Amino acid sequence: MKTKDFRDMTDEELLKEIDGFKTELFNLRFQLATGQLDNPARIREVRKGIARGKTILRERELKINRA
């Protein structure tokens, strides 16, 4: 998911999206541990998605406007 997509979301939607990413990350780590993970790069994508979402929330909290 692109940063622009995150910026278009409301805070509530962002929190739901971050929660969904966290759940997905948990499941991916579980699959990794059991040897059933098909796409290991997805773990990195999900972690970055969580980071992007949290960054946008923090920017809004501090009232920083970014293009």
UniProtKB/Swiss-Prot annotation:
CDD domains: Ribosomal_L29_HIP (cd00427)
One cellular component (GO) term of this entry: cytosolic large ribosomal subunit
Gene3D superfamilies: 1.10.287.310
Key word RNA-binding present: no
Record-level GO BP terms: translation
Upper taxonomic lineage: Bacteria, Bacillati, Bacillota, Clostridia, Eubacteriales
Family: Belongs to the universal ribosomal protein uL29 family.
InterPro entries, per the entry: Ribosomal_protein_uL29, Ribosomal_uL29, Ribosomal_uL29_sf
Protein name: Large ribosomal subunit protein uL29
GO molecular function: structural constituent of ribosome
Keyword Ribonucleoprotein among UniProt keywords: yes
